[in-house]
């Protein structure tokens, strides 16, 4: 992208005029200017120089009474789904931009571009041409925090092939190597950069980290190729403030070390004698795996880095604050090494969770997995809030049919008897929160006996409530280390089906149930010779990990719905009978 288009060129302008402007601003060019009526083209040595020309000249330099407009030269056939957005406010929250971009369609990827300017630049790919065109029309000149956005097309190499990829989850790449897609595209990209580093720093050090007129934080940002958000306005009066670092793992670690060095220097200058520990915020979903079975993972990190690590208690969590504080004490070098190891484990956990989520997401039509709160949200700098605003484009029909099926279902989920306390929580607090969050009725059935190894959780609610409630229970068992760090949580779930539909679930010669097991990876058993209960229902047993179990439950409910529809009497052509008056 080193070829430039220069617009709004005066009829009096010549190639020499344009050459002198580029020379005046010390912008090299690698070929003569091609001047046409009202516009011109020129080649730059590389993309970085082209970006500098756009930032320096576009809308700022006048020639013969006309202000030049400079942007990437894009052939018509390549003006498809890719846009470049420039002049983004430097300290803007990425979630805000994410939400803005999402208003115009599916954002398949968004890569931040390295520039020498204070403002940020991103390359965005939309899922369709019309979405990109609408975003271009609406966002060009759009004011954000007194900065007017500048939007232009950039070459879309795939446009000629006419094969745009299917839309996926939005995510912003940090400064550094482009992420090359998003988790829901066909090829599995590297996901480490999706997990920002979240730090908690004493409020008295925030000023030193920012520096005079933001010079220090700008310097860190430039050196480490990162995007750093200091959340000064959060929790007014709090003793500590969160900092979010978006970058590659190496960039995050480098920024973390710089911030620790500044805090240590400030502590010495202000004669603070107590130790300043490193505090990392991590979503609770990942902490169980960070700790490991019997604390083995955490102990190993402590031994390898010569640090002392503590983690805030579960009681501090709420539905609105799902993060735990990991406190690391040791020398600066030791803390920096511990941060690398801790975040490596967190990123691995995130990558595994997202892989599992997207593996099954396309198999459950219309279910917006990101909206269900099973994975880190914007609070922890993870998946952004615009993702949860509704179903993905293209899944509208599925979403509506899913939403229309609001009939309540009852599922019996069997958990280890020892886990009952963790699910209920202190004075029943956790199970109440879970019930409110999921919109489901959740009850723990009495134990079958003193030596019972399992307890039954009775969950009643519509499909989405089932998904939320069961997902949180699976997650809780993992967090509380009832399963090993590399062990999948597999639970048995029982659902009741009408006896007249049991044969359809099994299929001829067991064909349907076998296909169901192959599709979902869950074990599905319809016990033979069951006596139907008083409601003429029999039990179907499903055993598997969360997504396998969910998919099997949904498929079985689909079969039941089909059977019920087929059994409904067809309406008479003559219409309903008219009631006679007595």
UniProtKB/Swiss-Prot annotation:
Domain (KH) spans 194-259, 275-342, 408-473, 490-556
For this UniProt entry, the molecular function terms from Gene Ontology, in alphabetical order, are: mRNA 3'-UTR binding; mRNA binding; N6-methyladenosine-containing RNA reader activity
Q: Which UniProt keywords apply?
A: Cytoplasm, mRNA transport, Nucleus, Phosphoprotein, Repeat, RNA-binding, Translation regulation, Transport
InterPro entries, per database record: KH_dom (IPR004087), KH_dom_type_1 (IPR004088), KH_dom_type_1_sf (IPR036612), Nucleotide-bd_a/b_plait_sf (IPR012677), RBD_domain_sf (IPR035979), RRM_dom (IPR000504)
UniProt-listed PROSITE patterns: KH_TYPE_1 (PS50084), RRM (PS50102)
Where's it mainly located?
cytoplasm
User: What do the Gene Ontology cellular component annotations say?
Assistant: cytoplasm; cytoplasmic stress granule; cytosol; nucleus; P-body
In Gene Ontology terms, what is a biological process of this protein?
A: mRNA transport
| Annotated Pfam families | KH_1 (PF00013), RRM_1 (PF00076)
Q: Where does this polypeptide localize? A: Cytoplasm; Nucleus; Cytoplasm, P-body; Cytoplasm, Stress granule
Q: Does the keyword Glycosyltransferase apply?
A: no
Give the RRM domain ranges.
2-75, 81-156
List residues modified as Phosphoserine. Answer: 182
Xref: SMART domains: KH, RRM
Q: Where is this region: Disordered?
A: 164-190, 562-582
Q: Which residues form a coiled coil?
A: none
Q: What is known of its domains?
A: All KH domains contribute binding to target mRNA. Domains KH3 and KH4 are the major RNA-binding modules, although KH1 and KH2 also contribute. They are also required for RNA-dependent homo- and heterooligomerization. The integrity of KH domains seems not to be required for localization to stress granules.
Q: Which PANTHER family match?
A: KH DOMAIN CONTAINING RNA BINDING PROTEIN (PTHR10288)
Assigned protein family: Belongs to the RRM IMP/VICKZ family.
Tell me the subunit arrangement: Homodimer and multimer.
For this entry, the protein name equals: Insulin-like growth factor 2 mRNA-binding protein 3
From which organism does this entry originate? Danio rerio (Zebrafish)
């Amino acid at each position: 992208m080193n070829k430039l288009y220069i617009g709004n060129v005066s009829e009096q302008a010549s190639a020499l005029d344009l050459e002198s402007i580029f020379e005046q601003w010390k912008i090299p060019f690698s070929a003569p200017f091609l001047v046409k009526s009202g516009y011109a083209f020129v080649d730059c040595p590389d993309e970085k120089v082209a970006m500098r020309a756009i930032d320096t000249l576009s809308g700022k330099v006048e020639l013969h009474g006309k202000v030049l407009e400079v942007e990437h030269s894009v052939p018509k056939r390549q003006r498809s789904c890719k846009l470049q957005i420039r002049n983004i406010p430097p300290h803007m929250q990425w979630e805000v931009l994410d939400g803005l971009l999402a208003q115009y369609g599916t954002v398949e990827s968004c890569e931040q571009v390295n520039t020498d300017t204070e403002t940020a630049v991103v390359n965005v790919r939309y899922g369709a041409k019309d979405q990109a065109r609408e975003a271009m029309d609406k966002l060009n000149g759009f004011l954000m925090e007194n900065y007017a956005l500048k939007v232009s097309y950039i070459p879309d190499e795939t446009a000629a092939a006419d094969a745009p990829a299917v839309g996926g989850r939005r995510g912003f790449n940090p400064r550094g190597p482009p992420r090359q897609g998003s988790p829901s595209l066909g090829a599995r990209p590297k996901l480490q950069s999706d997990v920002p580093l979240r730090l908690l720093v004493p409020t008295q050090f925030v000023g030193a980290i920012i520096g005079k007129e933001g010079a220090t934080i700008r310097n860190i940002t430039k050196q480490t190729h990162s995007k750093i958000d200091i959340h000064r306005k959060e929790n007014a009066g709090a003793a500590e403030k969160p900092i979010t670092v978006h970058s590659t793992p190496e960039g995050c670690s480098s920024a973390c070390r710089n911030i620790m060095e500044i805090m240590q220097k400030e502590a010495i200058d202000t004669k603070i004698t107590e130790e300043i520990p490193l505090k990392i915020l991590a979503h609770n979903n990942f902490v169980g795996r960070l700790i490991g079975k019997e604390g083995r993972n955490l102990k190993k990190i402590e031994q390898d880095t010569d640090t002392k690590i503590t983690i805030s208690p579960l009681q501090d969590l709420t539905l609105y604050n799902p993060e735990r504080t990991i406190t690391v004490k040791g020398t600066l070098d030791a803390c920096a090494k511990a941060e690398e190891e801790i975040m490596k484990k967190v990123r691995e956990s995130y990558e595994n969770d997202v892989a599992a989520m997207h593996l099954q997401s396309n198999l459950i039509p219309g279910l917006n997995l990101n909206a269900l709160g099973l994975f880190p949200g914007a609070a922890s700098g993870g998946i952004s809030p615009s993702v949860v605003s509704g179903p993905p484009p293209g899944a509208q029909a599925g979403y509506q049919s899913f939403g229309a099926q609001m009939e309540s279902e009852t599922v019996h989920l069997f958990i280890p008897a020892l886990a009952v306390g963790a699910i209920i929580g202190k004075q029943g607090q956790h199970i109440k929160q879970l019930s409110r969050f999921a919109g489901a009725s959740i009850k723990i059935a009495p134990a079958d006996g003193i030596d019972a190894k399992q307890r039954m959780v009775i969950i009643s609610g519509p499909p989405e409530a089932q998904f939320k409630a069961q997902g949180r229970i699976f997650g809780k068992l993992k967090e509380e280390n009832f399963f090993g760090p590399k062990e999948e949580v597999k639970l048995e779930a029982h659902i009741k089906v009408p006896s007249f539909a049991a044969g359809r679930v099994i299929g001829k010669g067991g064909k349907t149930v076998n296909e169901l097991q192959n599709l979902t990876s869950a074990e599905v058993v319809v016990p033979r010779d069951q006596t139907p209960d008083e409601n003429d229902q029999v039990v179907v047993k499903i055993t598997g990990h969360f997504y396998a179990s969910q998919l099997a439950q949904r498929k079985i409910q689909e079969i039941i719905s089909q059977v019920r529809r087929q059994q409904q009497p067809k309406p008479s052509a003559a219409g309903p009978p008219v009631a006679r008056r007595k």
